[in-house]
């Protein structure tokens, strides 16, 4: 991220995010510099939720609802009926490419500020892997100016709970099934899941903020190279992705 070469001279965006359609909640609260692209925001989210950059992703921004929220923040006394006459398109999608002429979209490599994040409460959704149907709901909590904060500290996670996703497990329903199987730790289904994942333990309640902040300074760059330049990870990067550093 460019912001690491100096102080955080750009606004800092603080988001609350949550894996949709899954209980117990898997969530993250995090901060990013305001000069990143929507794609970079995606790489940060993918890192935090254990997504392995093996599927396409996009963002949906409810621009009409967010703009109404912004107008309310500017003028809390403005009548609701006047706000709802706003005629902008309801949803803007940020994607790498688009084959559907009926949707309003922008390149996902556009700067994040193009999504018109202006006040607390604005929302967006990240979708990953259309087959499994993972969705991460995000809410902008705050826009901060902290010129004393070294840019190298961003992005950073402030808090969270839960492990994240397991690739190609069938979405939230499959993740819940995996959680149940590994909790029982017995039977043929458990043995099959162990072989498939290559592990005998799976704690979907675990979250290590220190480890995640370490990964957030490194992995988003690897994902950027994969999606934007078609560069496959080196063995060193693969070792990082697989947390081989924890086994030393």
State where each predicted segment sits.
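Short linear regulatory motifs enriched in tryptophan with gly/pro/ser
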Residues: 1-248
